């Protein structure tokens, strides 16, 4: 399978969750006497995560424009953030629908749930790094990029977790369940921070490859030119 075909859509994530959870009404109880999440509640939670991801793109783009104003990064930023957002979708699919990490409905199961801390590194592992380096034509910089990626997974998983838990309970069923009004905003900040850290890691890895790794900028630019999404970044690098 081509690397760019592993990025799930939100429709695919919802479809897999629907398939795995079924249409239970949320009447069963799980541990701590909580109600098992209904399909409707679970889909609301997915929509929270989706909204947080959409907002995070805008937040990260604005922040990076200010941070790297002296590098004239605007010409590559929109496409680069789009690629990074797709990479983060692999993480979201892994966590929410079990796409990469395992079967079932991901880390949350049927209940309220929370993401295990140890999942951060797994979610940002080899498949994720291979995908983004492949689509940008940056496989050559892998040794300077891969080790720094797992720690960034925590930003994405925190954001997903906050957005997910922003909806609690089904109306009329759980008297203690209510939506947290600022959860999506807080979640988007975490996800945006993840996007920013990936950009910084990528740019730093390119510099390290060309200096410590004694890589050739012209050769790297040609590799990026031949990739699905790296041509513009390669041209910018040569300026």
Where are these regions (language model features)?
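Short membrane-interface loop/juxtamembrane segments of multi-pass integral membrane proteins
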Residues: 163-189
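Hydrophobic, membrane-inserting alpha-helical segments
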Residues: 132-135, 139, 181-227
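Charge-rich, low-complexity amphipathic helices
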Residues: 99, 106, 110, 167, ...
